[in-house]
């Protein structure tokens, strides 16, 4: 339980347990794909996905920074994350770490069954989303939020702020 008795359940697929979970709450915050919520009855929105390749390197640093984006056409990945720099490259005792782990992020086409990451911003998908938004507006108990629920590109700081603001206004 969290503040004001908001129950949080992890590793629970809302859509597989929708009836039981809906019965427990006055409001639902749904951040999954809006088209999935409505069982794709108007059609499937398009998304982009990503895949990751992880590598343990036998050296103390690869890029000296947590995240580096690559925007040139010649580089096949879009980003490299060097995880140790989120903790400033030190262990719990403040010692330098002798190895590093990197993750290369590759953009990939999305197909049903893949993890959707980013909405496809074009006229066709915008029009289909507008129709789903009408259905969503008719669901007063459900707050649709996030990249997938609003079918909108957000940086993570933006989506966290938007969801917190929305919850603040809806739940108080």
Predicted regions span which residues?
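Generic hydrophobic/packing signal
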Residues: 6, 31, 79-81, 159, ...
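General small-molecule cofactor/ligand-binding pocket signal
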Residues: 7-11, 143
């Amino acid at each position: 339980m969290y503040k004001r008795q908001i129950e949080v359940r992890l590793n629970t697929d809302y859509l597989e347990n929708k009836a039981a979970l809906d019965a427990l709450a006055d409001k639902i915050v749904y951040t999954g794909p809006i088209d999935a919520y409505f069982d794709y009855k108007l059609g499937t929105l398009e998304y982009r996905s990503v895949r990751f390749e992880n590598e343990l390197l036998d050296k103390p640093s690869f890029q000296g920074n947590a995240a580096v984006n690559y925007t040139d056409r010649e580089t096949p990945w879009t980003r490299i994350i060097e995880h140790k720099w989120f903790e400033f490259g030190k262990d719990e005792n403040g010692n330098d770490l002798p190895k590093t782990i990197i993750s290369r992020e590759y953009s990939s086409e999305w197909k049903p069954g893949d993890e959707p990451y980013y909405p496809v911003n074009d006229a066709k998908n915008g029009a289909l989303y507008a129709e789903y938004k009408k259905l969503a507006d008719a669901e007063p108990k459900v707050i649709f939020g996030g990249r997938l629920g609003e079918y909108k590109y957000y940086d993570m700081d933006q989506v966290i702020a938007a969801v917190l603001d929305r919850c603040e206004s809806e739940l108080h």
